[in-house]
Amino acid sequence: MKKGSAVIKTLRVILSALALCVATSSAHAADTKKVDVLLVGGGIMSSTLGVWLHELQPNWSMTMVERLDGVALESSNGWNNAGTGHSALAELNYTPEKADGKVDISKAIEINESFQISRQFWAWQVKQGVLKNPHSFINSTPHMSFVWGDDNVRFLKKRYEALQASPLFRGMQYSEDYDQIKQWVPLMMEGRDRNQKVAATWTPIGTDVNFGEITRQFVGYLKTQPNFTLSLSSEVREITRNADGTWHVSWVKLHSDEPPQSVDAKFVFIGAGGGALHLLQASGIPEAKDYGAFPVGGSFLVTDNPEVVKQHLAKAYGKASVGSPPMSVPHLDTRIIDGKKIILFGPFATFSTKFLKNGSYFDLAKSTNLHNVAPMMRVGVDEFPLVQYLAGQLMLTDDDRFNALKEYFPNAKKEDWRLWQAGQRVQIIKRDPVKGGVLKLGTEIVASQDGSIAGLLGASPGASTAAPIMLNLMQKVFKDKVATPEWQQKIRQIVPSYGTKLNDSPAKVVEEWTYTSDVLQLSPPPKIDLGAPSQATGNAPARPAKASADMAL
């Protein structure tokens, strides 16, 4: 009897302990802060999505978590990217030559139309007072393509002629004349042999963009809203799904003795740049299993010598050397960062196993698993020329880099230039049922089937198209909301061209250029012939291109 009594007492103790655990767990769940949206990462993507959602659903609560001590300190930082407002005006890799010798401009049209959405989104934010002083983040900077050699000159002329079929590119000028090109870019022509066969295109509607400044202003605005909180120096350590379909996300405060913090979020966006893949994998969603990643860094030669800088106002893109992958395209760029004008030349590829400039050398190893190791190895075989190129880049000396600069700036002096390590880019490798693994172009939205969590992978064209990329994300994860009259009306108010193929309407192009140039305080747009019909196949999907063509350094 005593023995039975002891067993009962033991059971009571166990049950009491279990009840206490359940009660504690329930109390913990009840105490955990609830938010509608959690933004992981404090860069251009997360901040853009935050502003979009605040416009469309101002009553939603949002929390942003950033690992570093401030926002826009990684890839969005002005010193960690080339600051090109990518619109395919100058980048030759967006207009590949087909087997029949014709130039395919479908990708260029797609990129350009996306950038027009960004211009409209930024213009609206200026009108609302969210963004202030447009010259602090965007400035008119002509975009140029510059080539030499008979084959390259022939290609550039064909490219120019093909692009004239689209109203988006009709402000472009073409020249093979030494003196004309010297008027556009004196620094690139002085000291050059007049007999060298050169050609250039020039368009005044190009831009230089400080994505770090846009990010800081976006987050600065969001911080003034009562339902937004920002947590800096906060590293996400755990992402788990709750029974009700929400996500429990925990993070630790770095450089602090504060206890870990957590939220339960209805929707999680992982906009952590190079850190996004690891966090998507940590969430356990099956959609993340298809992806691996390969990090590529970039460095630039930089000068801030006023005598040099005043001679160049352009972003001048070249053509990859014979035998080199298209990602190796060098460019000589005017930059305006925090009010100071500088010139960058590059990029030169660098390698690190880090996925972020401020990341860990174990990033590559931590992201590799049984699901993606085979696709990654397959890409290494299929993209061997790319591997060779990267290996060659790592062996470059200071003299090699300076000699590359002199091909664009013949009178360059070594003492005027210094080498700057820019940011890391993580290129997507996706499992493929036929090839095993493929290197993916551009950026890719990875979302759970129910749309409760999503992340952005990839690099190019990246920040330039943050507004349309986040609009696409909302159409994917908030499909029902986007379809409502309220959201539709607001989206069209922010982006007047929403749902319109600008390529098919020269009048709409002029209207959009004029509106955004005025609000963003850019140079007046070029005049185009409204009577000339658009003959470009902008409605056709962009043709698949070699993946390395779109790799972003």
Swiss-Prot record:
Its EC number(s): 1.1.5.4
What GO molecular function annotation could you give as one example from this UniProt entry? 2-hydroxyglutarate dehydrogenase activity
Catalyzed reactions: (S)-malate + a quinone = a quinol + oxaloacetate
Keywords on record: FAD, Flavoprotein, Oxidoreductase, Tricarboxylic acid cycle
Q: Which cofactor does it need?
A: FAD
- Note the InterPro entries from the entry: FAD/NAD-bd_sf, MQO
Q: What class of enzyme is it?
A: oxidoreductase
Pathway annotation from the record: Carbohydrate metabolism; tricarboxylic acid cycle; oxaloacetate from (S)-malate (quinone route): step 1/1
Q: Which Pfam families match?
A: Mqo
Q: Where is this region: Disordered?
A: 524-553
GO BP, sorted A to Z = tricarboxylic acid cycle
Family statement? Belongs to the MQO family.
Output the NCBIfam families linked to this UniProt entry: mal_quin_oxido, PRK05257.1-1, PRK05257.1-4, PRK05257.2-1, PRK05257.2-5, PRK05257.3-2, PRK13339.1
Specify the protein name: Probable malate:quinone oxidoreductase
